[in-house]
Each structure stands twice: as C-alpha cells, then as structure tokens.
C-alpha cells in the first residue's frame, strides 16, 4: 500500500549538535533510480553516532537522522533495481560496493569511490537525502540513517542477507561487530599461535578479541581503563587483562615485559591518538603489526620513526576491511552457523523512543550495545 507514495513515519532527528534527539514524524520520499526504500526493524547505537553528535567537526551536518548499524526489509525499489525484491531482508551499508570502480575491482581494499562519502565526510548532500521534516531537508548519516522506521539507500550500499536471520541481532553486523572482527582477521591477519593486544573493550574491541580468537591467537591481552569490561572480554576469548591505571610505567612497557618484547598484533579500538601510539609501541620490533580501528579526525597521530624503521607496521582498517555486499552476508551466515557471537554484545534493548537513554548508556560506558526496536 505504501509503494510509490511518500511515507510518513517516526524517526529520531538530531536538529543540532550536543542536544538530545527528538522523535519526529518525517516524510520519506519514494526511491529514485537505483535506490531501495527499506523498512528498518532494528538498529544498534554506535559510538560514531555519538561522535557526530558531540565531538565531530562537521557542525553543518544538521539536522540529520543518525544511525548506521541497522537491519530491515525491502519495502520498495526504484527504477533500475534488479538485485533486490520487496520483502527481502537486508543490511544497509555505510561503505558501498559498486563493483566497478578501481577500488572494488582490487582485492586489497573496501574503499569504494561511488558512495556518498565522496560528497562529504559523514552526511549525504542535501540533494541526495530522501528525508524531510517540518518543511526542511533532513540529512542522512553515513548514507544510511537507521534511526528511522524507513530509509532510502542506493542499491550499491545494501547487502542481502539470509531470510532466516533475526534482524534484531544481525543489525550489529552493519558496523561494530564486523568492524572489530574484520580488523583482526582481514587487516591485521592475525596468525595462529600469535600474541595479540586489544585496546578498548567496547563492542568493536570485543569483536576484535573475538576475531583474534577465531584466527587462533594463543594469547589475547585485553586493555581497558574500566575493569568491569574484563569479564565480558573473557567470553570472547581474552586470556589476559590489563588496566593501565594499575601501573606506573607506560602501558607499552607493561605489555613488552608480559610478552618477551612485545605483541605480534595490536588493535586500537578507542579512537584516541595517544592510545594509537601506545598500541604501536606495544608491538614487537621486526614484525609487530598495529591496526587503527577507533575513529577520530580531531588530532594528528605521532611516533618516533625508529618504531617503524625497526620493522613494525602501522595499518588502518575501516569496516573491518570487508567489502559490504560480499562480507556482511558471510558474517550473517557465520552467526547462524554459531561461528561468530552476536547476542553476547547486546546488553540492552529498548524502543526508538528511548534513543536518548541509549546514547547516555554508551556515553557513560554502561553498555556494550543497545539495540533499538523500530517496529
């Protein structure tokens, strides 16, 4: 009944930075050429949503509907869409996979150039957004906007998933869990029998721990200032736990002493340039690999050149190195086959109306993942 019509639905709108989100009725346009309109069933709340709201530089990125870790059902498709049918289960992707650009054609990267990100760093341009509220254009965040009952996404930024997948759980594969798991498996390429350190035990860090464990690491050192996170890290395979506040010497020295000179692989899952440096310097010279996973663009990152000259490698990872259309369905299948944990990340469930409570929980480190229901 909704096909071909503008849909009025509920969404959480961020009218300006540093203010609570407001539940509004918005209008969601029909999908244009090559676009898909998706009924969002559930969405996680990710730290990157908070980053845009509270810390990001992009003050012109408002009003906006945040959310980029969602799952839903195809409601309708625009002209030229052949890959998707109404009723199919999908996960919208904040990194597209057009399949045609030189990045998509290379196995080395997932950095597709066809997506929204070439217009601006974090929101769709006003001409691309399909949302309006109270007569104003409302921007779409990371090309997705899952804090809305309906959203419109280009078909190159949608992954089709197993019809048996529970949407209120696999939504986490739209960002956090895939990001951390893939950083270990795809980017760091953690080796069996290796020693790893993971800095920051939010959902991304815990997923990185799970990735290290899945890759066969024999020792996984979990590092966090909040010791409450250590029990959870154990569930995902961590073997050792370090709280930097318990030590007077730098954390890199603590880890170096624990591991006979340094770890083989480290993953920074915080988004703090000081921690990034510590993660690199915790690696063993000669072959240690450190991966930046946590997101920030507010400061420069630095280290002494000898750290790299001595054979360490510094890498970055976005969305776990997964090409979305290929990787997300595989991760969903891995979950259904019980090879990847998801339920253990979910500490809270609430309706969309409680989105500000979910944001507060994350801001104060009181949750791993909160899943919002949009039904």
From Swiss-Prot:
Presence of keyword Cytoplasm: yes
Q: Write out the GO MF terms.
A: alcohol dehydrogenase (NAD+) activity; S-(hydroxymethyl)glutathione dehydrogenase [NAD(P)+] activity; zinc ion binding
Please, which domain of life does this record's source organism belong to? Eukaryota
Fetch the SUPFAM superfamilies from UniProt: GroES-like, NAD(P)-binding Rossmann-fold domains
The record's misc note reads: Functionally related to class-I mammalian enzymes, but structurally related to class-III.
Q: What is the lineage of its organism?
A: Eukaryota, Metazoa, Chordata, Craniata, Vertebrata
Q: Where in the cell is it found?
A: Cytoplasm
- Organism of this sequence: Gadus morhua subsp. callarias (Baltic cod)
Family indicated by similarity: Belongs to the zinc-containing alcohol dehydrogenase family.
The name this protein goes by in its record: Alcohol dehydrogenase 1
Q: What class of enzyme is it?
A: oxidoreductase
Q: Which residues carry this modification: N-acetylalanine?
A: 1
Q: Which BP terms does GO give this entry?
A: formaldehyde catabolic process
Cellular component per GO, a single term: cytosol
Keywords tagged on the record: Acetylation, Cytoplasm, Metal-binding, NAD, Oxidoreductase, Zinc
